[in-house]
Swiss-Prot record:
Subcellular location: Cellular thylakoid membrane
Composition skew (Polar residues), residue ranges: 107-116
Family listed: Belongs to the ferredoxin--NADP reductase type 1 family.
Keyword terms: Acetylation, Antenna complex, FAD, Flavoprotein, Membrane, NADP, Oxidoreductase, Phycobilisome, Thylakoid
Gene3D superfamilies documented for this protein: Nucleotide-binding domain of ferredoxin-NADP reductase (FNR) module, Translation factors
EC number: 1.18.1.2
Protein name: Ferredoxin--NADP reductase
Amino acid sequence: MYSPGYVATSSRQSDAGNRLFVYEVIGLSQSTMTDGLDYPIRRSGSTFITVPLKRMNQEMRRITRMGGKIVSIKPLEGDSPLPHTEGIAKPSQSEGSGSEAVANPAPESNKTMTTTPKEKKADDIPVNIYRPKTPYIGKVLENYPLVREGAIGTVQHLTFDLSAGDLRYLEGQSIGIIPPGEDDKGKPHKLRLYSIASTRHGDFGDDKTVSLCVRQLEYQNEAGETVQGVCSTYLCNIKEGDDIAITGPVGKEMLLPPDEDANIVMLATGTGIAPFRAFLWRMFKEQHEDYKFKGLAWLIFGIPKSENILYKDDLEKMAAEFPDNFRLTYAISREQQNAEGGRMYIQHRVAENAEELWNLMQNPKTHTYMCGLKGMEPGIDEAFTALAEQNGKEWTTFQREMKKEHRWHVETY
């Protein structure tokens, strides 16, 4: 349905999720959580755990819960068993994991996933590697909820396998998703674009995945009937192991500048956090040798309730670990009040921090990004208009100057 090469592509990808990787883990300690494991926890040094690709993220979260720290991830050479079986434990039954512990790490000749090529040149921006008539057919590796009980709406984090193709992307780009089936006119559904929520190296760090942050669209039509978005509903309900038709990547407007000393102001509402998750993961979580962020990253994030804060634990952990380089500000509309006693929206946070934001924006190294619902734009413009007037400038003129300098970036929908 999607392309003449669909069957062949699907066949090549059928075993993608079974590729094996070796985690080197330190810091695991014996506890009630680790007592059920079939491999011993070392008192010192490293523990090595073999993990299939499709379970990498689950295993990362499990290791974190047990107090461990992953110091390296390496592909198991040839995706085959180790050359000897001595010291290899049975698969762990803890939390349904299909991982194994090994007595020895993978050969040192294997390239670790934290080793990366040099920074891409500015003109080396991948665009439309896969098009609607010949999409890439990937596999769903993960689909899990991002909001907590009591939240408004449904938001999912999805990760797709790219190992059987050559799709690559940069932080700030988007991919297209083609939902299966036909519309009410008998025509194939049109693709929908989604901002990429992972860095160029993917959530597993091996350059073989791409992730999205998707909210299920739901609204009332003129007849008062509840209508659900075709593509967002498809994505929120897709199962691990299912095929997914992907196009792209597209977009040059929202790219993260390569300058490690840049200041990055990010204004997001809801799933508009997606490109900024990619930015922040590259700045603070990956820590690659070819990119060491030294500037200030400031995220002002608008959400309706605390339960709707996406990636909350990761964001707050980064803010605590990098207080000199990352600032996190929430605008929680249904829980916080602005200075006038009304609901706290993102524009009110801009007004509260007017002087500091204005001073930052005068710096030619500062880039300002806005991503989220289109309805956020008027309020933001109003806040910046007042901000500019206080400093003797006209906002539209200053905004035009920043656009000309490629320092003002907007992606709303």
